[in-house]
Curated annotation (Swiss-Prot):
Coiled coil: none annotated. Keywords: DNA-binding, Transcription, Transcription regulation. One of its GO terms (molecular function) is DNA binding. NCBIfam families: PRK10216.1. This is HTH-type transcriptional regulator YidZ. The keyword Transcription regulation applies. The gene is yidZ. Residues 8-65 form the HTH lysR-type domain. Pfam families: HTH_1, LysR_substrate. Belongs to the LysR transcriptional regulatory family. Residues 25-44 bind DNA. Involved in anaerobic NO protection.
Amino acid sequence: MKKSITTLDLNLLLCLQLLMQERSVTKAAKRMNVTPSAVSKSLAKLRAWFDDPLFVNSPLGLSPTPLMVSMEQNLAEWMQMSNLLLDKPHHQTPRGLKFELAAESPLMMIMLNALSKRIYQRYPQATIKLRNWDYDSLDAITRGEVDIGFSGRESHPRSRELLSSLPLAIDYEVLFSDVPCVWLRKDHPALHETWNLDTFLRYPHISICWEQSDTWALDNVLQELGRERTIAMSLPEFEQSLFMAAQPDNLLLATAPRYCQYYNQLHQLPLVALPLPFDESQQKKLEVPFTLLWHKRNSHNPKIVWLRETIKHLYASMA
């Protein structure tokens, strides 16, 4: 017999969604500000109501049953609609609203001041938390710890960072595409040489450790040509590579996105940018689509929709 929703405590559905996100009774309890015992009791009630285990224990935490997997999208949509309904009376000035962002630097630093002003104009009591994009950021979006991410992906067919490789639960929108440049100080000796692949490879390079990898599409293209660059230094962020490349008497070359020109102008670094010495087909493999990323469950969340549109508008005004 079909059960009526009137026989179910709807608070249990929130517990169910958090269990699906966290795959842990303890972590779900922490987010609900209750004890793990209370979450376990709620899970027992849900199992009885759905007549299904819903989750089973595994070495990686709670593993959802086929029924739970089939309900995930419907549950997320139901929660979105509930949030929309509850948001109505407070849509203009909600208290305690938090914006959790993950972005690579200096991508967010370029517009952080303008974005924060927009947020505080609309939500005066909001708080903003910005973290650097790293190997765990996609999982953080899935876990609900990050509202929206802003990061570059890759276009090389052999890359692990293709847009097509994103998890199915992640939605995205490409804001702009960029091709990296070579950044070197204004008095670098390479500027007095013919700029070609041999010159590019003659000098030591700064590499960015990206999502736990020291190599990226640039190294794939060089490998296809039977060439290799000398990586003398690995750093976690683009702005650090620009800072080091700008140091006096430094022979290091930094390869970073073209948008860093804006960052370079803001901080008046003594750097010039040269194109990577590749043909058009090779340049195409190095194209970086800079992308907003969010979880599908937040596709209609008013806060996330507003944030996406605000970031899009800010970058359009800089183009």
